[in-house]
């Protein structure tokens, strides 16, 4: 009985885990190196070691890579508003939502890099504004579901998203060492102080 020896001229590629994470890392690197507008999906996929088809399994387009967590964040905040104590004021319910955000905003370096990319492209800045507007709408709906009327629900939601944004900008600022949650709580107190009569 003879045996057959098979020789491979090319090394066989082994499946690598975490395609999504590798795509996100490759995209960030390329956006910083070449600019968002000059980076293609093909380049991102190649750098990540996957096909373009794999890219589109995870992301609708290259812009959405930067906002992939938006729906999760929105749901987290809406759930926190809904779960706030029944006697909570609208701003206290919004405060619960901001506390919830503090549990996901922990990777400061990634957040700084992501914001650098967004700040470099006007279409990404526009997308970010749209996402914040949708967040405010969702929070207002959650407040209305708690029995908060208008305009109080929309005012509290817009104020909360304002605190959310200012806290984020403060958190990613060079030299900051405080957590997002601590900054957001401090700003919410400042917001309450601003609205009190002097």
Can you describe what each PLM-predicted range is?
Residues 1-7, 144, 176-198:
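C-terminal peripheral helix-coil segments that are non-catalytic and often amphipathic
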Residues 51-59:
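Short hydrophobic/aromatic patch on the recognition helix
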Residues 1-34, 38-50, 67, 76:
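Basic, helix-initiating cap at the start of DNA-binding domains
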Residues 75-114, 120:
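Hydrophobic alpha-helical connector segments
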Residues 46, 60-61:
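Residue-level detection of the helix-turn-helix DNA-binding "recognition helix"
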Residues 146-189:
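Hydrophobic/aromatic-rich alpha-helical bundle segments in the mid-to-C-terminal region
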Residues 107, 133-157:
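Hydrophobic alpha-helical bundle segments that form small-molecule/ligand-binding pockets
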């Amino acid at each position: 009985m003879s045996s057959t020896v098979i020789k491979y001229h090319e090394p066989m590629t082994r499946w690598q885990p975490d395609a999504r994470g590798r795509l996100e890392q490759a995209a960030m690197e390329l956006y910083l190196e070449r600019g968002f507008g000059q980076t293609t999906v093909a380049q991102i996929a190649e750098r990540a070691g996957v096909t373009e088809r794999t890219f589109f399994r995870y992301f609708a387009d290259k812009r959405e890579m930067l906002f992939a967590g938006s729906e999760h964040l929105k749901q987290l905040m809406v759930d926190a508003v809904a779960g706030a104590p029944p006697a909570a004021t609208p701003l206290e319910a919004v405060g619960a939502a901001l506390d919830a955000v503090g549990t996901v905003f922990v990777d400061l370096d990634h957040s700084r890099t992501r914001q650098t990319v967004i700040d470099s492209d006007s279409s990404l800045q526009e997308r970010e504004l749209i996402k914040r507007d949708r967040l405010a709408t969702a929070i207002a709906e959650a407040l209305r579901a708690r029995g908060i009327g208008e305009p109080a629900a929309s005012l509290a939601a817009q104020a909360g998203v304002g605190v959310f944004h200012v806290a984020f900008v403060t958190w990613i600022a060079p030299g900051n060492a405080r957590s997002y949650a601590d900054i957001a709580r401090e700003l919410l107190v400042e917001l309450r102080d601003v609205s009190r009569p002097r």
